Amino acid sequence: MKTVVFAYHDMGCLGIEALLAAGYEISAIFTHTDNPGEKAFYGSVARLAAERGIPVYAPDNVNHPLWVERIAQLSPEVIFSFYYRHLICDEILQLAPRGAFNLHGSLLPKYRGRAPLNWVLVNGETETGVTLHRMVKRADAGAIVAQLRVAIAPDDIAITLHHKLCHAARQLLEQTLPAIKHGNILEIAQRENEATCFGRRTPDDSFLEWHKSASVLHNMVRAVADPWPGAFSYVGNQKFTVWSSRVHPHASKAQPGSVISVAPLLIACGDGALEIVTGQAGDGITMQGSQLAQTLGLVQGSRLNSQPACAARRRTRVLILGVNGFIGNHLTERLLREDHYEVYGLDIGSDAISRFMNHPHFHFVEGDISIHSEWIEYHVKKCDVVLPLVAIATPIEYTRNPLRVFELDFEENLRIIRYCVKYRKRIIFPSTSEVYGMCSDKYFDEDHSNLIVGPVNKPRWIYSVSKQLLDRVIWAYGEKEGLQFTLFRPFNWMGPRLDNLNAARIGSSRAITQLILNLVEGSPIKLIDGGKQKRCFTDIRDGIEALYRIIENAGNRCDGEIINIGNPENEASIEELGEMLLASFEKHPLRHYFPPFAGFRVVESSSYYGKGYQDVEHRKPSIRNARRCLDWEPKIDMQETIDETLDFFLRTVDLTDKPS
């Protein structure tokens, strides 16, 4: 049976050997070039392929149409993937009439995603395994063909567990590959409600946070022990690595991170104490804990920290343009909740951020981005992270003031992007779910969905294409000039301080604010073209948590990424949104202050938005990038968001002249 194989690492080598032993004909192997910054302790797929006389390739992007065509010419009957590090596009998967199969290092549906070997140890699991599953468009989500369980011993570290998994994988493939060859397999669908997903790990993720329990820190040490980069901490600015450890149930009142003793080297944790058995100072040699203490100059009572002392003193400076807006003010609140951010903001108003004005780490200037260009350039140069959140983002303005939308949303933001390029500053840019336009995909995917808009004589698309072109400009600056960037695409975020009722009175607001105004004034709720259009509504708290994690950028996982931030489970039509809002309104304790409900009224979009409007029937995000890069899932139910948003707006209404 002819096959094409995608493989890397030890699992890739043993997978290839198993295929050959089972009588498969391998037409080509696709692998990766080794990363010079990665310790190569594993077998070389490229070398094995060369020794076996099999053509081998390592393209940067195997999903490029040219490679898809070359693979199609090989006419594979079946495709296998063994620890290949990139997602394989659906066009390639569909080339094999007998299907495509992937070997994954966990007991799916648990631990989908990257580095399951390390994550199970980090999380203190006692069992894992290997799974052979059918490949589908969504990573690690296809039906299970075979699994083998592997026990995790208390003394297992990453390398010993790796060897166990390799042994299990050989057994599993020996048993299963002949059955696949003869079409004699039983597939079991994964239980989505049991699925968990984890993102890529980098060396920077393995710092020891001493406020955590000793058992948690010991698991971190096990998960990244040699030949992985190791768990680490600091004494002042001196970095050291912990290669092995033991948990002590030591009852101590010492502050977490304090040295309890140096022989053995015992460190106080949030719960218990951790003995550092072996470690390494800087780029030195491995030594026992007591010698490490001497090398680092530690004595009883010394304090360790999770980051260099100089870094701990320096707050990250974040520039938010449009800080008084819906996202800006909520993000400011989230950043100031931590003690390592300095927020600089500019906006034309300050009502939503008045609660921060006396905060020592919040600095605000009232101004217009089209006028205060010198102030903006200076602060781009001064700050570490830039978020240009200023935009006209209400649909009625797209047809009413298309040129103003272009001037502000495109031209002014392009200038800020160029400042970031000039001063080599990280930019986190708010793209929009609008860029997907009339895409027909069930889930809008950042990396694969087409961006489809209407004709030029429909000015409603000027916002979408302005944002899309900026996305492409930023991407090009990243590719050609090294701009550090992340694009995020919000999907219908809702919550307190979204617009205001005065904006709704002139039609320049989002949908829920307009509906609340109708209820407050006793006017009919207008359902544009029947209100059947579906959206996925996302609580502002979920959205801001994801955005905060983008700013944190653990392990630089967000660099160069486009990330949808939305809740695909909170899908509802505008009509359903209105009905849910009405039910919440009728139960509200302030309900008696407002007029009777005036009913729903269906209106044509042209009469509401004006000439040149087109609507989108559905807009549902894929959030695989958010899961992978941020370890993020939305949690808040739509009804809770509606209740809190309604309550906020009703309490802003002056009730002094309302009948009680």
Swiss-Prot record:
GO terms of biological process kind: lipid A biosynthetic process; lipopolysaccharide biosynthetic process; response to antibiotic
Annotated site residues (Transition state stabilizer) in this chain: N102
GO CC annotation, single: membrane
Gene Ontology molecular function: any one: UDP-4-amino-4-deoxy-L-arabinose formyltransferase activity
InterPro entries attached to this UniProt entry: Arna-like_SDR_e (IPR045869), Bifun_polymyxin_resist_ArnA (IPR021168), Epimerase_deHydtase (IPR001509), Formyl_trans_C (IPR005793), Formyl_transf_N (IPR002376), Formyl_transf_N_sf (IPR036477), Formyl_transferase-like_C_sf (IPR011034), Lipid_A_modif_metabolic_enz (IPR050177)
EC number: 2.1.2.13, 1.1.1.305
Pathway note: Nucleotide-sugar biosynthesis; UDP-4-deoxy-4-formamido-beta-L-arabinose biosynthesis; UDP-4-deoxy-4-formamido-beta-L-arabinose from UDP-alpha-D-glucuronate: step 1/3; Nucleotide-sugar biosynthesis; UDP-4-deoxy-4-formamido-beta-L-arabinose biosynthesis; UDP-4-deoxy-4-formamido-beta-L-arabinose from UDP-alpha-D-glucuronate: step 3/3; Bacterial outer membrane biogenesis; lipopolysaccharide biosynthesis
Reactions the enzyme catalyzes: UDP-alpha-D-glucuronate + NAD(+) = UDP-beta-L-threo-pentopyranos-4-ulose + CO2 + NADH; UDP-4-amino-4-deoxy-beta-L-arabinose + (6R)-10-formyltetrahydrofolate = UDP-4-deoxy-4-formamido-beta-L-arabinose + (6S)-5,6,7,8-tetrahydrofolate + H(+)
Formyltransferase ArnAFT as annotated region, ranges: 1-304
One Pfam family linked to the record: Formyl_trans_N
Positions that bind UDP-alpha-D-glucuronate: 393, 398, 432-433, 460, 492, 526-535, 613
Region annotation Dehydrogenase ArnADH: where it falls in the sequence: 314-660
Residues carrying the site annotation Raises pKa of active site His: D140
Active site: H104, E434, R619
HAMAP family registered for this protein in UniProt: ArnA
Similarity remark: In the N-terminal section; belongs to the Fmt family. UDP-L-Ara4N formyltransferase subfamily. In the C-terminal section; belongs to the NAD(P)-dependent epimerase/dehydratase family. UDP-glucuronic acid decarboxylase subfamily.
Role played: Bifunctional enzyme that catalyzes the oxidative decarboxylation of UDP-glucuronic acid (UDP-GlcUA) to UDP-4-keto-arabinose (UDP-Ara4O) and the addition of a formyl group to UDP-4-amino-4-deoxy-L-arabinose (UDP-L-Ara4N) to form UDP-L-4-formamido-arabinose (UDP-L-Ara4FN). The modified arabinose is attached to lipid A and is required for resistance to polymyxin and cationic antimicrobial peptides.
Assembly: Homohexamer, formed by a dimer of trimers.
Protein name, UniProt field: Bifunctional polymyxin resistance protein ArnA
Gene from which this protein is expressed: arnA
